[in-house]
Amino acid sequence: MKRAAAEILHEYGPFPGAERVHGVTFDGQHVWFASGDKLNAFDPASGQAVRAIDVAAHAGTAFDGRHLFQIAEDRIQKIDPQTGQVLATIPAPGGGTDSGLAWAEGTLWVGQYRGRKIHQIDPETGAILRTIESHRFVTGVTWVEGELWHGTWEGDESDLTRVDPQTGAVLERLDLPSGVMVSGLESDGADRFFCGGGSSGKVRAVRRPRS
């Protein structure tokens, strides 16, 4: 297993009206984050907030290229980012204990926080296709170039962990500074992760290592 200190490249926020950051995703242009009763978008080039959608947004957030997916209590909502309309709803596998959310080549990966699990599910039905175990509490989840990464938070320590999506074996860890929490997690598809900062109200960009 490879292990290194995480390199924080930039901090965004806190943002007006958003006391906490839950899920985080990236639509290719804007970073979206969940703040409880809203989905908020900002421009990572300028750090400026650009829009918000009034919708329940309690945990993980994902983007499939067209739609946003958002955990709200015990369900996952499919949302049209143009109109803010909820198009469909499926049950969340953790029944309200869910954390991170990631779109991955036709399926969703869903973190289960205290259960220390990550479920791969069918985005149409919510059916669980696979479950892998984590070594710590699971926060955000992201999928990039065939790699499955998730955030952890336990004992006042956080890291970004890359795991084998078949077995759950830990392949790589990036340790964040003590007290820096990772809530949501997303990749920009290249060299950065966007990490939700929980009650700090911030989103941090962290360098993604290239193997």
What are these regions (language model features)?
Residues M1-E7:
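Blade/loop signatures of beta-propeller domains
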Residues I8-F15, G47-I53, Q85-P91, A127-I132, ...:
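A short beta-strand motif characteristic of beta-propeller blades
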Residues F15-G28, V55-G65, P93-E105, H135-G146, ...:
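Beta-rich, blade/repeat-based domains predominating
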Residues V31-D37, L68-D74, V110-G115, H150-G155, ...:
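Conserved beta-strand positions in repeat-built beta-propeller and related beta-rich domains
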Residues G36-P44:
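Beta-propeller domains
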Residues N40-A41, Q77, H119, T161, ...:
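WD40 beta-propeller blade core
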Residues D43-G47, D80-G84, D122-G126, D164-G168, ...:
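Short loop/turn segments that connect beta-strands within beta-propeller blades
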Residues V182-S211:
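Blade-level signature of beta-propeller repeat domains, shared across WD40, Kelch, NHL, RCC1
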